[in-house]
Structures are given as C-alpha cells and as structure tokens.
Amino acid sequence: MSKRKLSRQQRWRVEKIQAERAERAERRARRDDTSLDAGDYGPERLGRVTAHFGRTLEVEAEDEHGDLQRHRCHLRANLEGLVTGDHVVWRVAADGSGVVVARQPRQSVLERPDARGQLKPVAANIAQILIVFAVEPAPHPNLIDRYLVAAEATGITPVLVLNKTDLLPETGSDLRTLLARYRAIGYRVVAASTQQEGGLDALHACLTERTSVFVGQSGVGKSSLIDRLLPDMQLRVGALSADSRKGTHTTTTATLYHLPAGGELIDSPGIREFGLGHLEEHQVAQGFIEFQPYLGHCRFRDCRHRQEPGCALRDAVERGDILASRFDSYRHIVDGLTTR
C-alpha cells in the first residue's frame, strides 16, 4: 500500500509544529543557561534516571542525610537519548526540581529499533536481561531466540525466566523439554510462580545486587512478578484476553525500582516481537552461542550457511552437535532480514 501524500496545507502545519517545538526547546535552553549563570541552581550532583517522561526525567539522588530522593528534572536542549538507568550530572533548584546537565559514560545499553528502524535506547547500565515468558500465553521458541540474539548483541547477560510454573504439568510437557535444551546450551533458566509458596525464591536470588531489566511479551505476568517483588508498589495488572490469550500492556514507561534484598529492576513496556532488522547475518549467527565454535571454519569465507558445500554449521547440525530446531530458528530470523 502506497503512503498517502500530504497536501500543501498539511505539510505546512507539520513544519509549523516542528518549528514551534524547536523554538520552545531553544527558549528553554536559554532560560536554563540564564538560571545556571545566575546561580539559581545548586552545585552539580550525581544521580540516576529512574523514569523518563518525554522532555522531563525522574532523577534519584542522595540528600544531605544520605537518603534517596527523587526529583523531576528537565533536560538541557543538547542532551538527547537519555533513558532509565543512566547515571547523570544534575543541578537542583530551590523548589526541588532540577536540570540534567550531562550524562556519564554507560557501562551497557539495551537498544531496539523504533517504527522507522532506527535504534532507540531502552535502558542503560544494566547487568542482565531477564527474558520473561510463561506457560500461558504459550511461548514460541523463535521469539525466545530473538530475545537471546538481541541480548547477545548488546553484550548483556540474558536469563530466561519461566513464569506461572504452577500451570505447568508435572510430567510430559514439551515446555520442560524446551527449557532443558536452553540449559544444555548454557543459559540460566529461572522458574517463578506468584501462586506457590517459595515460588519466587530463585528469582530473588537471581536479582540480588544487580541491575536487571524485564523484557517479554505482554501477558506473561511481568507486572504481577514486580508486584510481588516490590510489595509496596501498586502496578496495574492486565488480564489475559479470553479469546486470544494474549496479554494487555500494563506499563507505559520504563521505571527503575529498588529491590528490598538489594539490586534494582527496570520494567519496560511490553513488546510482542523484538526487532532484529538492525543486525547483519553474521551478528545473528554470533547470537546463537553454540554456533560460535564453528563460525569461520566453513570451506568458503563468504558461506551463508544455506546450501554451500563444506558449511561447518550444517555439518554440526548433521552430527547432532547443534540442534536442528535452533538452526531452523536461525534461518527463520536471517530470512526475515532479507525482506527488510
């Protein structure tokens, strides 16, 4: 379907709105500069972004007593792309609000493509990505693989979290077989349930003393898990659709929470598919960690692991060293890249 062309009047209105936004940002920057030069803001302080609301941020910092306080801050016009988890330099005003003047170097950043295919940061300075899936809605292995590839591309440690294990049959479950395969590859798999006593013990241990981010389909129970992990927080929990068994989105902005036992958790808006269109084929292959010993050992340097003779990956699949299901998942992802 071709895109609808804008009329001359519509283009003028769009350009006018964009110009007004740019002018407001410039006026705000001038006010900030004037206030900073006049000493209306206090000295520079260190803080961490705990939530993002458009042109304003929620920044957490210690007060004079060492207690953590959160302040609503706005950004200098020359600062773009700040996300929850960023460590920043900011200055506070007399009314408790503030202005963020700089971002400190990131240790890690989680990015995913936006609607235009441009990489957009989601969270920063995180130690592990918790990929949450559930017995219901039923997880699809290829979707799990997409999350794993995306995590491997960032260099951030992924952990698989199976939620709603109280719904899992004791024996004969295909899901149990799937989890065993991921464990055999080398991934950590954590079981969780909000309906069973001690059902979150393993998850608590996994989260302690780390900054983690939850990702996963809507409806897998992320908000319910956080409600239990953070009993003082009240998060709206969406109900599963009786028809599609797909969940409703319950979180609208990425937010950082402190866990009672130590560590932090960043909850980000639910997504149903993790786009990988920004990756090249060789990056996808690297994201399948069991492929790595065989990459670079094909007969041809430009082997695409299709029908080429002497393909080390295909030979490994035939020997049973690589699961055929994982190789098929890889091919499905790579084939999707060719249509972008």
Swiss-Prot record:
Coiled-coil regions in this chain?
none
Needed co-factor(s) = Zn(2+)
Q: What is the lineage of its organism?
A: Bacteria, Pseudomonadati, Pseudomonadota, Gammaproteobacteria, Oceanospirillales
Q: Which PANTHER family match?
A: SMALL RIBOSOMAL SUBUNIT BIOGENESIS GTPASE RSGA, SMALL RIBOSOMAL SUBUNIT BIOGENESIS GTPASE RSGA 1, MITOCHONDRIAL-RELATED
In this chain, Zn(2+) is annotated as bound at C298, C303, H305, C311
The keyword Phosphoprotein is annotated on this UniProt entry = no
Its protein name is Small ribosomal subunit biogenesis GTPase RsgA
Catalytic class of the enzyme: hydrolase
| EC number(s) given by UniProt | 3.6.1.-
